[in-house]
A protein has these predicted regions:
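Hydrophobic/aromatic residues within the transmembrane alpha-helices of Major Facilitator Superfamily
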Residues: 18-21, 25, 52, 114, ...
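Helix-loop-helix junctions that connect adjacent transmembrane segments
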Residues: 3-4, 40, 44, 122-130, ...
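Select transmembrane alpha-helical segments in multipass membrane proteins
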Residues: 7-17, 83-97, 134-138, 197-211
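Hydrophobic transmembrane alpha-helices that form the core helical bundles
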Residues: 32-36, 47, 54-139, 143-147, ...
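Residue-level signature of the transmembrane alpha-helical core
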Residues: 14-21, 47-48, 52, 92, ...
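Membrane-interface "cap" regions at the ends of multi-pass membrane proteins
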Residues: 1-31, 35-40, 54-62, 71
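Hydrophobic/aromatic residues within transmembrane alpha-helices of membrane transport systems
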Residues: 9, 23, 64, 83, ...
Length: 233
């Protein structure tokens, strides 16, 4: 059995979770959520509901990790509860579908924002080939950092996590500044929809899918529970 080095403290573990949650989703999903609900009050409601539901899942994972402090996350939990077959299916689904798609999404959104900056400077966007190369390079770079070990990658996560928190804080600050000055011209129904019916409820439900994607990543620390100094925390 492999003995893992416990190189991750509470700071690094928290940074890993923050970096996974504040990924591509939080920067990419607000626009489609706003397009679905159409007003700021329901926009905020979607994020609050998504956050509450996410907290329920995170608390369950925290309890399971404290009870079963083993690396592997959902694979380990399913193996303990339902046996190796179900856990095997979940593990391969994560490898071939969910985690792989998540990595691709993060790299593409990163490239999309770099492309936007490049277009502002040069006046022309990237082509398909440069987009592919930059996305691939991003994946290779982050993979290379992780190959140097948990200790180094944990330190990078602290830096990346702090940078993302600052970026999100800046976006929130700019938004609140715009509303405080009465600049709501970008919204057709700034605070409440003109009519509220089943179509509004369905729109909120559809928008929740995007918020769940944006909040995904809270299970990140469970994958490396045996490399955390005190996983019970």
């Amino acid at each position: 059995m492999t003995d893992y080095k416990k190189n991750l403290g509470i700071k690094e573990s928290t940074a890993i979770v923050i970096s996974r949650i504040i990924g591509s989703g939080i920067f990419r999903t607000p626009a489609p959520i706003m397009a679905l609900v159409g007003c700021t009050s329901l926009f905020g409601l979607v994020w609050v509901l998504g956050g509450i539901i996410t907290i329920f899942g995170a608390v369950v994972y925290a309890e399971l990790t404290a009870m079963i402090p083993k690396s592997g996350g959902p694979y380990v939990f399913l193996k303990e509860a339902y046996g190796p077959y179900i856990a095997f299916l979940r593990g391969w689904a994560m490898f071939f579908v969910s985690e792989t798609a998540s990595i691709v999404a993060v790299s593409l959104v990163f490239t999309e924002f770099i492309n936007a900056i490049f277009q502002i400077i040069s006046g022309e966007p990237f082509g398909i080939f440069p987009t592919f190369i930059l996305s691939l390079f991003t994946i290779w770079l982050l993979t290379g950092i992780n190959l140097f070990g948990v200790s180094l990658s944990g330190k990078f996560q602290v830096v990346f996590g702090a940078t993302k928190v600052i970026a999100v804080g800046a976006i929130i600050g700019i938004t609140l500044t715009g509303f405080s000055t009465g600049d709501t011209g970008h919204f057709t129904d700034p605070f409440w929809p003109k009519d509220f019916g089943w179509h509004t409820v369905l729109a909120i439900g559809a928008a929740l899918r995007y918020s769940f994607f944006a909040f995904s990543g809270w299970e990140g620390a469970t994958y490396m529970a045996e490399e955390v100094k005190n996983p019970g925390k």
